[in-house]
Amino acid sequence: MGKDRDKGFRGAKYNPSSSGEANTLMGSQSSGFIGFSAFSSNLTNATDPDYYQVEPEYKVLLKKLQKKDSISRIKGLEELNSKFQKINIEDAEFNISSISPLMNAWEFMYKRLVNDDDRNVRDLASQCLGSIGSRIGKHLGPHVKQLLGPWIVAICDQNDQSINNALLSFQNIFPEKKRKDVFKFGHDEALTYLCENLQETPQTIGDSKSISQEILQERYERCISNSLLAIEYLINNTTATATDSSSSSSTTTTTTTTNNTGNTEIYEKIFESQFFSFFQSKSSNIRKTAYRVLTTVIKKLAGYVEKNFKDFSSKVLGLFSEKDSSTHLYMWDAIISFLQQYGDKAWSNVDVRKHVLPRLWAFLRSGCYGSFELSYPSILPLLTFIPNSIVIGSPSPSPSPSPNTNIDIGFFKELFTNLEKGLEVVDNPRQYGNPNSVDRPSNLLLSCYLECLIYSSKKWGQQYQQINDYLIDTLLFNFYNNHFNLEHSCFSEKLFIEKLLESTIKLANLSNSNLLKIQNLFNSNSFINFNNKENLLNNNEPITTDNNNNNNNNSSPIIKKQEKIIQPISKETLISRLNTFIIVCSNNNNSNNSNNNNVIQVIIKRLFNLACDNLNSNQELSIKILDFILGNYKIDQIISNGLDDIKKIITQLALALNESLLSTGGLNLGVGGDLVSVIVGLLALVPDEDEIKLIWSQILQIFLDSINNNNNNSKKKNNRSNLITNTTNSLVHLINSASNKINRNLLLSTTLFKSIKIQDKKQLQLIKSILFNNNNNNNNEFSPIIPNESVELLIKWVYNKLVDIINTMVQLNLVFNDNDKGGDNNNDDDSDDNDVSIDYLVELSKLLFSSRFKSKSLESLLIEWCKFNIEINNRPSLSGFKSKCNSIDEYLFSTTSNIENDKFILSLLIESIDRNSSTIITNDNLNLNFLSNCAIKLIKSGSYRHDENGDDDDDDDQLYSYFIKEFTSNQLVINSKDQIKISWFRYNRITPFYLLDNYGSNKDNNDSTTFSTDKLLKVLIFNFKVIESFGLEKFIKYSNKENNNSIELLLLNLLFVNGDNQLPPTPTTTTTTTTTITTAVVVSTNEQILEFIENNSTNLLNQFIESLFKFYGDEIFNCNWFNCLVSNVGGDGNNGGIYSVLLALFIDYITSDACLPTSSMKLKSALLNSIKIDNDDNGNSIDSIRQLNLVQILLPILQKESIESYKQWSINQLSQLSSSIPTNFKSISIQLSILSSIVIQRQQQQHQQSQKEQQQITQDDNEILKEKEWLTLLNLIQTIQQWNSKIKSAIIKQQEPELEFLFMKEVELSCLNFILIVIQYISNINSNKSKQPIYLSNNQSQFVQSFLSIWLSNNFTLLSFNKFKSNYYYQQYRNLIEYQSLKIYNIIISNDNIKFIIPGIGDQFQIDHSILILNNWLNRVSNSRSNNNNGNTSDSSYILELYSNTFMKMSNDIKYKISLTKLDNLIELLSTFNYSTSIYNNKGIKKTSYNLLESYFGNENTQLVKSFLLENENNNNNNNNDDGEEKVSFILFSNIFEKILLDFDSTFKPMKKSKDNQLINSISMGQLMCWNLLLLNYSKIDLNRRSILNGWLNDNNIQKVTLFLNQIFPFINKDESPLTTTTTTTDNNGNNYSIEFPFSIIDNDQLITYRMIQKLCSNCFYSLVNYLPSMVRRWADDNSTNSKMNQQIQSYITRFISPIIIQNEIQRVNSYRCTDSDSSDAKFQIKGSTSSKEVTASYEKDEMTISLVLFISDNYPLRVLTVEFSKRVGVSESQWRQWLLSMTSLLLTQDGTVLDACLLWKNSLDKHFQGVEVCPICYSMFHNGTIPKFQCKTCKNKFHAGCIYKWFQTSHKSNCPLCQTDLS
């Protein structure tokens, strides 16, 4: 590498260090370096590193530092740094003598590392130096001289590190006060080292054979730059600057060094030998560094500069030739520092005009070579240092020069001309962004240009007139001239004007002569001559500039480009620039300097006069200028003759406005708008109103004369109409604009409105302008410019037209939809008075309503619009008008000034709901949301009116009072109590004996009642919406004042809406268009009702009860309405149940969390005190149903003592019963009911308490009944069973035929809960292992079985109910029994309860009753599908959910057996959509069906497909005929199942067009369920039976899987994984399988959404790939020609599916263990790796090992495994190939897993070594579960029977495939 610098060890850096000097500088010894005074003796000289003396561990690390790769060096430095940090010289075991050789070696190595190519290496080397220096302390002293040079190089390293580790190391080792001593101590050696570095070249700095030239060049530049910076660092730390004060006239700074003369000479030698040569280096980095050092030399080494001043002047002032912008910062620093240091002397020793100025001019012409931000701000400082001798040719200006002195101004021409030429480089909008950006480089040039111009005028222009003329008349004028004449501008517009105006003012402030010269400049005709401007604007010829005129004083302006076409300025650009110019002038007009204001006023006056003089010749430009000026200046600042000038100008402007109107055919908002603005501005300056009227009359006369003159000459009617419209628009615009400045009454004119033709819809905007000051008023306030009587005429005209339209449409019952025009008039000519569109009336009415004009006629118009709006929103035939009238809704249904009108409008809304069916608007056509919103809006607006009047009393809210009175007086509302239907499932607090009291009622079959229910629902919802919007507290407050029954009515009607009252079926007959529309409205109305009931009704009822408690407090129980409520609880018929429910709701609130505990206790006490329960003398006993219901409702708040008393009373009474049949069953029923309610209530409380305390409460913790009491109940079961047996006996039936009916009627309801609590008790006892189990006796068990059988089989003893099976109460009774019996059955089959409750016959009992439950479930589903269920759909929801839970608890064996009986029914439910049930139930039905079918399909013995062999009749006659081949037919077990699987026309095909159709989505989900069941069965059966199912999937050349994949794949979200943790199941080995349907996907959503179908499709797709990979591969191959489809398939499987399948395959392989049944004595091992995707299998037998490796591809199973046999000792090549074919066949055609393939290989090996050969036809040892047994007697080869038979069929001969022997 280059020269051998170590040869001979020459040079100062290898000289011995001065230990004597070091000794004087070292301090006391310490662990840290504290100075050189610590040395007490001389040290031995260190020469070449002695590696033999270095410790071996360091020697190894130092050798690592010599490695070529940087990674090794970095690791070596890290280890070395770690070693250095562990050095402890104070340790007794540390060898001090080892430091010297180590440091000698480190010196040698560090010098190499500081210029390493890797930045990290250089940084780590400095860290190592810091570490060892801080550890060895004073022992570093002898090595400082050799280390200082490279150390400073490292400090000055120009890397991108945020932390300078070399500098940190230096500062940590040496204290601040000792650092100067360090630099002195090692100064000479360090400088010598740096000088040697400067001698390097790219050829000597490295080996060019092994290192690229680029790296060498980079290394060379880094070495030179860092060395130069290191020299600068030494200079700055060893010298100081001082000012020589001996000569006051001297401008130079002398430098004295604190070092010796020898050091200065060393610097001089460095600079003389090679420093200036670096200025010519090709490396910009080296040149930049050299310029930086040059600045330091100028400031620090003044003596050296003085000695070589001529060279320095030439070099420094010649730096303008530098073209690299990255170096210009230091270049300018050096130049300015040199000129500051030496002033004029700097120019004396150099030929400026030959050596300096040409380079400077070239620098400026080139745009400073790109350094805009640095160079342009530096040109002015440079100009200040240029002496006069160079500028004007004389050493200094004369003290009093003559103004006419002739001097050379060539310097200024060159300076400013070259700056102009530099603009061609700088002005590049594409490169430098937005032309209007303030950061444009041209803006920097502009600032530089103007600053130099001002400075030149100030320094030289004031003394030499010639210079000043050139600067102002030529240069400054050209700026203005070009800016207002040329389109292109190189500068930002606003910044240019600001800078130019600022410079103009500064020039004017320099002297009075400058001010006069500038004023004359602006007053001259050449400054913005409008006549010339007009010619310039109309001239299409471009202007061409020539560079031949550049030497002329009137040279081309700065903006012109040489030899380029300059585009004249456009009108828009000129107007924009003039506007900006005037605004900037206005901003500068507020200065206190009179000269500033004089200059600006001269400019503005000149512009104003030009605009006024050219109004006729150049109207648009003149008007714009006038508008700009008047908007920024006061008129008295511009004109001098006052009012006369204003009148003259206004007249000129009015004529111009009229001329513009006639020429353009209308008001041009560009020119005309500006004209109006200027006229208004001038008109507002007239102080006298009489003068304003006079001027205004002149303006009107101008327009009227124009209309009349043109009217006489006009031939067409349309022209006259347009002229009137345009003229009126102009006047309206003018009046509206002047209204804010002038009294508008002075400008009003009745003639204006008379010229308008109202029926012409073109006049709409004109009318709006007349009524509203919409040009100057953002709020569009009503401010008409016509008299009030004219407004009244307009209102009456609109009213009459609207009435005519309404009467016509209502009487004729016209039909209009959205496609009709609705009476629109599209005629552009004058419209006929009788032909007015509804749209036009809407717009006119909106204008009038928004005006809030106080007029009775306007209120009448409002009422008429309200009528019409009600009609169109509730009549389908007028639905097309909704869109046309929507915009007027905000103005309707607002209060008028008359309360009677408001009540009339409100009555219209109420009556629209309460109309008879014979009217036009029927209850089936109501838009409830619209009507309620209108009523709310009307009442609220009335409240606001009272608030505005300062009256907050609710008594004055007459509209609300009127509404409530109408509500409470409605007969439907009053009679709603008779139609309330209560669902037992919602309010199951009491024993529903009212169901038995109402069994004879048949109200459901009365058509009039059904219609009343429908109508009542709509009336109630309308009223509820209004009441809720105003707050329930307001309703309560009103009701309390009126003291009426409104609260009770509201409670009952809220309960009615929350009950089971259903809407009648929607009519579906559609015969005409009108009927179709009506049907749509009916559905919409019903949806409104259902939506309100579902979302608001329950909350509203609870909120109302809460509001009642907040209003009344504990006084609520003393209210008459509450006492009435309590008195009706438990009464006869339906009313008893209704009031029981209401009381229960009040108690629910008291016991809820919404009621505070203190308030709850108070309310409980008050309620119990207010309710009197009639008891007998014996204590707490119950004798009536009313009393029973009261106690049952009050149980949550009764005291424990009362509850205990009721419990003991019931038990005592029941314990006294005997086997004799009692005479009164009612009392027994009451006793059973209250006891059951107490137990159930207590169980619920315990459950709630356990949930709050998060702990399990056992029976022992708080017993409900004692063990003795439970035994009493168990005995009671036996007693009731004895009664039942006796009652059903033939004797009793003959003697008392009604006894059985009475028994079942009175006891059955009570037994439901009674049996439930007993069964629950037995279950709890038997689940407690510490308790003795309880078994029911035969009689007790028979009692449970008999009742349960009756209930589940629906064989009710109440035969009279059969007459009214459509009756609601019968259905409620049936639902109650069905639900409770299911709960009992649930408990029986849970855990092991069945063996305790039904001992001995549990299995048969479960099968028999499970079949009954399945049949009941199917019947309920069927009834709900056919809409025959008269009960509430919510009841069905509860029951169906309980059915689902019951089936889930059944064992798979039971479900398998019962599903066999109803397979087709269950399958059909998967694909059925039920409109009559909720979507949730629809999904629940599917889920339950799937759960039952899963037990069938998941059974491994289930065979879905059967195969049949079909023989062709020609087979026996012609064996050579191909048609004689035998065929196999496959039959699926169910036609319905097959239809669902393949019915794509009903699922995914229509889904492409309608993705949100619930019917399609539901059927599609059922189809996906069926496919999932099919795959479930496929996964359970063995490989041999899969071939039959595969045969059906491919039967009749129909690829069923391919068809299915083509349907579902487009719906899959390709960016989402198909399998989540919630949709997978895990087998015993922990492998994930998607064999269960992912119900977690659908359970979270209420609807069956398209997104849900997407997820289900992706899940099913995964299952297909997992279980049927061969068919998926075939499908993928078929789509390989479709590049887009193929890419999607490959990407989706590779990204999401393959990783899961591969993971499962590997887990399955690793979890495999050999079974005990394996009789082979061979050792078989198998293992897999997920990371490498490899499976390795080894087979060891008789000391012989055979192994294979299976490689799984990333897109497995699309791509089959690759098999490699790593060891095959003892097995032939052909045998291996046979096994490979067998494994490939298994994977390709039989869908085997990786483990199956490995086990097949193992079995093949076992058979192979047992002497069994593979079949030569299929190359497999196993076929259909058999081994080759058919043997050829000749060749002795054995074949599979199936293979050889197939061979005979295909080859049409019976010869051996190998030896061709006839085998027949």
Swiss-Prot record:
Domain of life: Eukaryota
GO process annotations (BP): protein ubiquitination; rescue of stalled ribosome; ribosome-associated ubiquitin-dependent protein catabolic process
Region (Disordered) location: 1-25, 241-260
Family matches, as SUPFAM superfamilies: ARM repeat (SSF48371), RING/U-box (SSF57850)
Catalytic activity: S-ubiquitinyl-[E2 ubiquitin-conjugating enzyme]-L-cysteine + [acceptor protein]-L-lysine = [E2 ubiquitin-conjugating enzyme]-L-cysteine + N(6)-ubiquitinyl-[acceptor protein]-L-lysine
Transmembrane segments: none
EC number assigned by the record: 2.3.2.27
GO cellular component, one term: RQC complex
Pfam family, one: LTN1_E3_ligase_6th
Any one GO molecular function term: ubiquitin protein ligase activity
Sequence similarity: Belongs to the LTN1 family.
Subunit: Component of the ribosome quality control complex (RQC), composed of at least the E3 ubiquitin ligase rnf160/LTN1 and nemf. The complex probably also contains tcf25 as well as cdcD/CDC48 and its ubiquitin-binding cofactors. RQC forms a stable complex with 60S ribosomal subunits.
Record function comment: E3 ubiquitin-protein ligase. Component of the ribosome quality control complex (RQC), a ribosome-associated complex that mediates ubiquitination and extraction of incompletely synthesized nascent chains for proteasomal degradation. Ubiquitination leads to cdcD/CDC48 recruitment for extraction and degradation of the incomplete translation product.
Protein's name in the database: E3 ubiquitin-protein ligase listerin
Native species: Dictyostelium discoideum
Gene: rnf160
